[in-house]
């Protein structure tokens, strides 16, 4: 999936993401850089709506929602789950979807 298609497909799921407690979603990695192969997964990190109870089970639910909707593997994490040594670089290259 190329960058523009991935952005459009993720943006089209904004309502479903918001309904699941997501305040913001960002595409990063090879797809965001325009370097994805046909079989590449989508790397996404999210910010959770403030004052929302959100667990690991909720995060897994969002991952499954996106994978079912997009028909592609999604590597999903929260902003806080980004590796501290890579976080600045990931945030610089990330494309905000929601």
Regions found by a protein language model. Name each.
Residues 30:
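P-loop (Walker A) phosphate-binding loop of NTP-binding proteins
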Residues 27:
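Conserved histidines in hydrophobic membrane contexts and catalytic metal-binding motifs
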Residues 1-24, 33-38, 49-98:
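Catalytic core of pol beta-like nucleotidyltransferases
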Residues 38-40, 44:
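A short, structured beta-strand/loop element
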């Amino acid at each position: 999936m190329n960058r523009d298609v991935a952005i459009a497909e993720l943006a089209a799921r904004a309502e479903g993401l918001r309904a699941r407690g997501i305040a913001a979603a960002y595409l990063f990695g090879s797809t965001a850089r325009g370097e994805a192969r046909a079989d590449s997964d989508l790397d996404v990190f999210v910010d959770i709506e403030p004052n929302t109870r959100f667990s690991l089970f909720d995060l897994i639910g969002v991952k499954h929602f996106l994978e079912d909707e997009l028909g592609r593997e999604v590597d999903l994490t929260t902003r806080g789950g980004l590796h501290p040594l890579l976080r600045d670089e990931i945030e610089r290259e990330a494309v905000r979807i929601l």
